[in-house]
Regions:
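A generic transmembrane alpha-helix motif of multi-pass inner-membrane proteins
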Residues: 372-385, 408-483
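Membrane-interface loop-to-helix entry segments
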Residues: 140-191, 222, 244-251, 381-384, ...
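Transmembrane helix-loop boundary segments of multi-pass membrane transporters
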Residues: 46-57, 129-141, 160-171, 297, ...
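Membrane-interface "cap" regions at the ends of multi-pass membrane proteins
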Residues: 1-55, 61, 68, 72, ...
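TM-loop-TM module centered on a large, flexible mid-protein loop between adjacent transmembrane helices
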Residues: 89-90, 96, 128-133, 244-314, ...
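Select transmembrane alpha-helical segments in multipass membrane proteins
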Residues: 21-31, 57, 65, 96-110, ...
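Helix-loop-helix junctions that connect adjacent transmembrane segments
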Residues: 13-18, 57, 133-140, 168-296, ...
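Hydrophobic transmembrane alpha-helices that form the core helical bundles
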Residues: 43-50, 58-59, 68-149, 154-157, ...
């Protein structure tokens, strides 16, 4: 069937996954856990303070607001095109299948290696040195990685219901601990005492470059996108997936603003300028000061965060591969499910293999370099994926979805979100341009991803293997409606 022959009424498919297994709390936690609340603070707080200073909570607020616009755009597609393919299907259906293929490739590079890379980065930079310094016990970082991955893989094979319950538990624990630490900071303020200064917009002029603080805060929110591939296992996906997309960003925006305010006050508003040059992670130093021996709960929160994000990315990555295998653009074996557990076992097998590859890369090239290179490559790719989805929103609602067309939602918001994405990439990678280090290598990896994607599309075109283009647009049809 040619793509042009696919009528909207024909574009549905039944699922082999377990329908109605995940409620709204699970959908929200899928996005929240992939953002990784405590790990995101580890990866972004010090860097953003170096640009935004006391106005760091505002940087997270503005960055979150911009991503709310993008999440709102994605929700416009999710509510009409529910599918385990997520962005792959949305873009294929609303814009073009070849554009959707890029989203599928990006998800294949983004979500599958998260477990090995996140656990490696956390264990190498925090867990091993902290446990050794605090207790004199030398637990090698790679032991944490292997143990963590074993747990994540176990949950993946057990089925979506159990893994989502584990996700809710681990994700909730980390948020409670991080918020408790922030409250402690507000109650037991550091030098400068309790202060509203971090929330005062009158202090914007004190930031060295608040704009760059906003730009880099956007990186902390990446992960909400993984809610999309859970559609076929969600209750009422046309409602819950859009809420999960937008809701996870809003919840984390409030979280980031509150906890960074608490940490700045706890560390000391008069010492905020020393945060970027601290030899140890300032949040950990602060936790040791106010919680004494109980500061180990911070390590527990970080470990929970790494486990939760790994589970969430396992789920999102395998479901995307399942949909791509079902459409035939990837080996059809990936579209098969276990008849008992309703899990895409072959996709899970492949995901386990990706952990091995990612871990091997870490051992060869080093934890920090591999993690930062990968993170930068994915960031550029996500912005391009956003823009493709935004084009799809405009195209769909000006044509097939004309009856629901809204100039604000379907033109203004997509244009603003796309423009913001372009500015983020420009300021992050080209102004100024760097020709060395992980940022540069991340740019090269992104270019390689695009080249491989184009070559694959050309190859399939030459070979006449284009049946997948129609199947890529198939939208999930529920066997029954669950509210």
């Amino acid at each position: 069937m040619a793509v042009e022959d696919l009528k909207p009424s024909q574009g549905t498919v039944k699922t082999g996954l377990r329908e109605n297994a995940v409620g709204l709390p699970g959908m929200l936690m899928q996005g929240i856990a992939t953002i990784a609340p405590s790990f995101a603070i580890l990866a972004s707080f010090v860097f953003i303070v170096s640009w935004a200073g006391l106005s760091t909570p505002w940087a997270y607020l503005f960055g979150g607001a911009l991503l709310c616009l993008q999440a709102l755009n994605a929700a416009q597609l999710a509510k009409v095109f529910p599918s385990a393919g997520g962005w792959y299907t949305w873009i294929a259906r609303a814009f073009h299948p070849r554009a959707g293929f890029f989203a599928g490739v990006l998800f294949s590079v983004w979500l599958p290696p998260v477990g090995a890379l996140t656990l490696s980065y956390l264990a190498y930079t925090v867990l091993e040195p902290s446990i050794k310094a605090e207790y004199g016990v030398d637990v090698k970082w790679w032991i944490w990685v292997i143990a963590g991955l074993a747990l994540v893989i176990f949950f993946a094979y057990q089925g979506i219901a159990l893994s989502e319950k584990a996700l809710i538990i681990t994700g909730s624990i980390e948020i409670v601990i991080m918020v408790a630490l922030a409250i402690t900071g507000l109650v037991s303020a550091g030098p400068g005492g309790f202060s509203w200064a971090p929330l005062n917009p009158g202090n914007f002029h004190l930031a060295s470059n608040l704009f760059l603080g906003v730009v880099f805060s956007i990186f902390a929110f990446s992960g909400w996108e993984s809610t999309g591939p859970m559609a076929e296992e969600s209750k009422n996906p046309k409602r819950n997936v859009p809420i999960g997309l937008v809701g996870s960003v809003i919840i984390l925006m409030v979280y980031f603003v509150f906890v960074t305010w608490g940490y700045l006050v706890g560390i000391g508003v008069s010492k905020a300028g020393t945060i970027p040059t601290a030899t140890a992670w300032p949040v950990a130093t602060f936790a040791q000061h106010v919680w004494s021996g109980a500061w180990v709960f911070l390590l527990f929160a970080l470990l929970n965060s790494a486990i939760a994000v790994s589970i969430a990315c396992f789920n999102g990555g395998t479901r995307t591969w399942y949909a791509m295998g079902r459409s035939g653009v990837l080996p059809t074996a990936l579209g098969k499910v276990n008849p008992k557990r309703k899990t895409p076992d072959n996709s899970i097998h492949l995901e386990v293999g990706m952990q091995v590859v990612a871990f091997a890369c870490v051992l060869i090239w080093g934890v920090s370099d591999v993690f930062i290179t990968w993170a930068n490559a994915i960031t550029i790719g996500l912005v391009l994926m956003y823009i493709l989805a935004n084009i799809g929103v405009v195209k769909y609602y000006l044509t097939e979805g004309r009856a629901q067309f809204s100039p604000l939602l379907h033109v203004v918001v997509p244009v603003i979100a796309s423009a913001a994405g372009v500015v983020v990439v420009w300021k992050s990678y080209f102004s100024p341009f760097t020709s060395s280090g992980p940022v540069f290598w991340g740019l090269l990896v992104f270019i390689a991803i695009v080249v491989v994607t184009i070559l694959a599309l050309i190859y399939m075109r030459i070979r006449g293997q284009e049946e997948w283009m129609a199947k890529a647009q198939l939208v999930f049809e529920q066997s029954g409606t669950s509210h």
